[in-house]
């Protein structure tokens, strides 16, 4: 069933496919603060209950997009005359929707990852070239002020030529566990966390370094989210899902769908339409993605990167250290210091605590002031939306196209291939035939930048820099 939408502003027209939680970032933007810049004219989903709920939420803001079943995707594009499609469906469906939209002559905005396998990367880029349209990947992490500032510092030459990066990301047992409940828990659906989650991180590294990876070797294992852990915690009587689990009250990684209005209305209330359970047991034997991963990368500009991702840490955050020939840049963020011990939902999160410190090779360290930001993902979501919908400048080149999306996903895809062969190195060129690289970055990433003079007065971020003392360890 569909009813042709009536645009509210005559602006660019958007259709949205895939109506899980993440879709509401875009739905609420186009029915709220960004509605003057774009009309939401179509909604599409495989679950009619989720579809009805999204229509209802839009109607509360007097926006009435047409509703379409997943099988009516092309009809939605024709009838709504959408200019662009926003793809927020499960990862394994991205390539299909992106290619179909491009063939229909539409631009595409897609959630990360671009897709989950190398063949689909090639397919998307070929379709984009043939169509002459544009694909944008929603890499919101680029937009957070702290990560943008890191890019500016590196580009300034403050630490000279970059030689190595250490990157550690910690997901806690609230956020991390969620990937083991949902469709992400199967490699064929998500590519595992090295694709679904780490595509953010590999994109940041690519963007910060102005390069792409040449070779990857990796190791992955399931160390925590497995039956043995549940047995060790005394959860011998665990069930298939949290809602019907005899061990629910004793499990510290349980999920109560009824405690969240959004989860209740989007998922629990609509299970009867497709049998999808949002709260499957995180310790189930059929899970085949890893919760502990490391990767060693060598980049085309000869930077070496060590990467570590764990999904069961006591707190959540990350630490990145850039080693350069003139010093180091360290960025450290605490997103959530701990998880409630009784398994209850986390309390409202405090603002992210982020520090950005430059340690010159000779001299005292200084801490940079990070511009304030509002909203999720370090303020990245709000800034990304303002740029995506066309009313904010992008002087730092944060917008990511399908090439950037492919080359970040390919790192995770190559890492998975390495793990499957016992850690053997995998050359990305063997996977990337036909996948163009993003536009190259200029100096300071070449050797000529290693010992050039750093003129602090040229860079606004130095105006509020504060010298600090760092104790030796």
Residue ranges and their predicted role:
Residues 8, 25, 289-473:
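C-terminal helical cap and adjacent loop that interface with cofactors, partners, or active-site loops
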Residues 65-72:
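Conserved SAM-binding strand-loop segment of SAM-dependent methyltransferases
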Residues 194-195, 283-287, 310-311:
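Short Gly/Pro-enriched turn/cap motifs at secondary-structure boundaries
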């Amino acid at each position: 069933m569909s009813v042709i939408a009536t645009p509210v502003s005559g602006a660019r027209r958007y259709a949205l496919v895939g109506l899980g939680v993440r879709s509401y970032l875009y739905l609420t933007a186009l029915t709220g603060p960004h509605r003057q810049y774009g009309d939401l004219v179509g909604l599409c989903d495989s679950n009619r209950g989720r579809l009805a709920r999204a229509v209802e939420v839009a109607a509360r803001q007097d926006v009435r997009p047409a509703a379409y079943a997943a099988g009516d995707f092309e009809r939605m594009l024709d009838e709504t005359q959408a200019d662009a499609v926003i793809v927020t469906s499960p990862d394994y469906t991205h390539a299909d929707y992106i290619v179909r939209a491009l063939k229909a002559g539409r631009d595409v905005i897609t959630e990360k990852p671009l897709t989950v396998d190398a063949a689909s990367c090639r397919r998307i880029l070929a379709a984009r070239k043939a169509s002459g349209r544009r694909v944008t990947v929603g890499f919101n992490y680029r937009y957070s002020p702290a990560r943008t500032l890191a890019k500016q510092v590196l580009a300034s030459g403050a630490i000279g030529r970059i030689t190595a990066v250490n990157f550690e990301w910690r997901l806690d047992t609230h956020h991390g566990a969620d990937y083991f409940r949902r469709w992400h828990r199967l490699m064929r659906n998500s590519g595992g966390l090295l694709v679904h989650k780490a595509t953010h991180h590999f994109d940041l590294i690519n963007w910060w370094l102005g390069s792409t990876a040449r070779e990857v070797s990796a190791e992955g294992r399931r160390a925590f989210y497995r039956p043995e852990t549940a047995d060790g915690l005394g959860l011998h009587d665990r069930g298939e899902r949290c809602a019907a689990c005899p061990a629910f009250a004793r499990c510290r990684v349980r999920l109560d769908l009824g405690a969240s209005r959004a989860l209740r209305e989007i998922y629990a209330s609509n299970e009867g339409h497709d049998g999808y359970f949002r709260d499957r047991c995180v310790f189930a034997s059929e899970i085949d993605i890893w919760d502990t991963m490391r990767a060693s990368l060598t980049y085309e500009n000869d930077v070496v990167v060590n990467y570590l991702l764990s999904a069961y840490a006591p707190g959540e955050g990350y630490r990145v250290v850039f080693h350069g020939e003139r010093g180091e840049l360290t960025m450290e963020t605490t997103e959530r210091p701990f998880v409630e011990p009784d398994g209850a939902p986390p309390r409202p999160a405090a603002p992210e605590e982020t520090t950005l410190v430059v340690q010159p090779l000779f001299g005292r360290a200084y801490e940079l002031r990070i511009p304030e930001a509002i909203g999720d993902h370090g303020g990245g979501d709000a800034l990304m939306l303002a740029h995506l919908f066309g009313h904010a400048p992008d002087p730092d080149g944060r917008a990511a196209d399908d090439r950037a999306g492919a080359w970040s996903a390919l790192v995770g895809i190559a890492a998975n291939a390495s793990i499957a062969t016992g850690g053997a190195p995998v050359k990305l060129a063997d996977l990337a035939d036909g996948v163009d690289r993003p536009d190259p970055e200029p100096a300071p990433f070449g050797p000529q930048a290693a010992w050039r003079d750093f003129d602090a007065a040229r860079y606004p971020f130095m105006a509020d820099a504060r010298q600090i003392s760092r104790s030796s360890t």
